[in-house]
Structure formats: structure tokens, C-alpha cells
């Protein structure tokens, strides 16, 4: 534990940003160029994955050129002491970046445009070319650093968040079944807990997409792909679980559903077996309880009555089936 403290203090992306800034400044100073514009570009180009850096860098370069071009143009027309120069440079840079679908580079383009205005004076062409060159230096340097230094590994984060998602899902499912048994079909507490789980699972899927991008850009062993596929399958199952869970949380208002004693006991046993997965590490089948709920659903389908009750029991059985397959 003590040997891992630094990972909580500074991350690989922070280190890569520092290295990119240092090398960018070195290259610019060696060429007698002002490094600040290149550094601005380098900072925003460090992305979670090498693929993202390359794709966004490809769009940030023309955006930066556009910003530098408008800075030179409006400085030539109004001078560097006019408010119009700053306002029009920023406005037209944003407008053109949006029209050309270069929004990802808008921020750095506007910053570059506004920052270079005071230093242009009469050297219009030189400043335009030098700012373009420094932008290229910043983009290339940060892109290479992001690709070569500390390639991101999100496996640990994904597994940690998946375990947390599992625990929260199972707990919420158990609590929601208790509410249903007690006829508390509207629950702000369950809705809030569901939203938290939903957002957490979105984070998992984002990290998995990052890791997949990294594997596609680096030569990795087959075991890396195998592990990623396992995590992806687990996240997909969680997504299905969450979807079915939402269907028993968000129910029509003023809904009334009555359950028999056997049905309540079946719901209790199934929800308890799912909740205990996190503590026991295994899934205890409740075949008799499942059969009880199936029989109820069939009876409701024949009579055509109480569709909400049938809907709730169906979703419970779908969740049970998902976990039965996972722990088969």
C-alpha cells in the first residue's frame, strides 16, 4: 500500500503533460520561437488515448491556423490596441471552426488568436508562419509523447468500477423488491440509487472504449484482448441488468399491485440470493421461487388482468436469468 501512494498523487497523464510541455519548450527555444503558443497546443492535445490525440490533433492544427490567420488579419485592419481586433478575431475563429466542424480545436485556436495579437506589430507574415510552426511542434510533440510514454492501462479501473457496480446493483435490486412487496411502488430513494449506478456503468463503458482504442494502436498480447473482452461482456451484462432494473423502478403513478404470500416469499428469496452474491461470491439458485413467478405470469396472461404485475414479475425473472447465465 505504501509503495502505491504516488499513484494517487500524480497520474501518468499528468506526467506525460509535463514531459510534453518540457520538450515542446526545448524545441521552440532551440528554433528561437516563442514557446507559449506551442505549449498551449501541447497541453490540450494530451488525451486519454493515443487515438484521441491523433484524431483531435488532426483537427486542432487547421483550427489553430484559422485563429492565427484572423489575428493577423484584424490586427492589420484595426491595430493591436483596438477592442474590435480581439472581438472579431475570437468571433470569426469560433464561426469558421464551427462551420468547418473543427469544434475540438476551437478553444486552443481562440486562445492562440488572442494571445498573439499584442506581439504581431508589423511582422504579419512572420508571426502567422511562426505561430503555425509552433502549433505543429506542440501537436506533434504531445501526440508522440502520448503514444510512446506510459500507454494507458485501464484494466484496474474498469475492474474496480465493475465490482462497485455489481454491489450497488444487487443491493438496489434487493431493496426495490422489498419496496414492491410492501406496495411502495414509487420511490425517490430507488430512483436516485439507480441514476448513480447508471452513471457508474457509463464510466465503465467509456474506460473500456479507451482501452480498446489503445490496444488497436499498440501491439498487445492476445491475453490483453482476452481480458478486455471479458470485461466488455461483464459490462454488457450489467447494462442489461440495469435496463431491467429500471423497468421495475419507473412504474406508472397511482399503480396498485397485490401479491400473494407465495409470490412475496418468491420475490424475497430471489432478491436475497442476488444480494448475497457480493458477499458469498456465488449465486444460489431459487428454482422453486422462479417456478412460482412463472406460474403467476402464465395465469395473468390467460386472464389478461393486471399487466403491471405481470410486467414486474417478468423483469425480475429476466434479471434472475442474466445472473444465472453469468454464474453458470
Swiss-Prot record:
InterPro entries: ArAE_1. Keywords: Cell membrane, Membrane, Transmembrane, Transmembrane helix. It is a multi-pass membrane protein. One of its GO terms (cellular component) is plasma membrane. The chain crosses the membrane at residues 19-39, 61-81, 108-128, 132-152. It is found in: Cell membrane. It holds the Pfam family ArAE_1. Its main location: membrane. PANTHER family: ALUMINUM-ACTIVATED MALATE TRANSPORTER 10. Belongs to the UPF0421 family. This is UPF0421 protein SAR1980.
Amino acid at each position: 500500500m505504501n509503495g502505491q501512494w504516488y499513484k494517487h498523487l500524480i497520474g501518468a497523464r499528468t506526467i506525460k503533460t509535463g514531459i510534453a510541455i518540457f520538450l515542446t519548450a526545448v524545441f521552440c527555444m532551440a528554433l528561437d520561437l516563442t514557446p507559449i503558443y506551442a505549449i498551449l497546443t501541447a497541453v490540450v492535445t494530451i488525451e486519454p488515448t493515443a487515438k484521441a490525440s491523433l484524431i483531435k490533433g488532426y483537427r486542432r492544427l487547421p483550427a489553430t491556423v484559422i485563429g492565427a490567420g484572423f489575428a493577423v488579419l484584424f490586427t492589420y485592419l484595426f491595430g493591436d490596441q483596438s477592442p474590435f481586433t480581439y472581438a472579431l478575431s475570437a468571433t470569426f475563429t469560433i464561426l469558421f471552426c464551427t462551420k468547418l466542424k473543427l469544434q475540438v480545436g476551437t478553444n486552443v485556436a481562440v486562445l492562440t488568436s488572442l494571445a498573439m495579437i499584442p506581439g504581431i506589430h508589423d511582422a504579419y507574415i512572420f508571426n502567422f508562419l511562426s505561430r503555425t510552426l509552433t502549433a505543429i511542434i506542440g501537436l506533434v510533440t504531445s501526440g508522440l509523447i502520448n503514444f510512446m510514454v506510459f500507454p494507458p492501462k485501464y484494466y484496474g479501473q474498469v475492474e474496480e468500477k465493475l465490482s462497485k457496480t455489481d454491489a450497488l446493483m444487487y443491493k438496489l435490486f434487493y431493496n426495490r423488491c422489498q419496496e414492491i412487496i410492501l406496495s411502495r411502488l414509487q420511490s425517490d430513494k430507488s430512483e436516485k440509487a439507480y441514476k448513480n449506478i447508471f452513471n457508474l456503468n457509463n464510466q465503465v463503458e467509456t474506460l473500456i472504449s479507451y482501452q480498446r482504442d489503445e490496444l488497436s494502436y499498440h501491439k498487445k498480447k492476445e491475453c490483453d484482448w482476452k481480458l478486455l473482452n471479458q470485461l466488455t461482456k461483464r459490462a454488457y451484462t450489467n447494462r442489461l441488468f440495469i435496463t431491467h432494473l429500471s423497468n421495475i423502478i419507473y412504474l406508472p403513478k397511482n399503480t396498485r399491485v397485490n401479491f400473494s404470500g407465495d409470490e412475496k416469499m418468491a420475490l424475497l428469496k430471489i432478491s436475497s440470493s442476488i444480494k448475497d452474491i457480493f458477499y458469498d461470491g456465488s449465486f444460489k439458485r431459487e428454482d422453486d421461487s422462479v417456478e412460482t413467478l412463472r406460474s403467476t405470469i402464465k395465469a395473468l396472461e390467460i386472464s389478461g388482468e393486471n399487466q403491471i404485475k405481470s410486467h414486474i414479475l417478468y423483469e425480475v425473472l429476466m434479471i434472475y436469468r442474466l445472473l444465472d447465465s453469468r454464474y453458470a
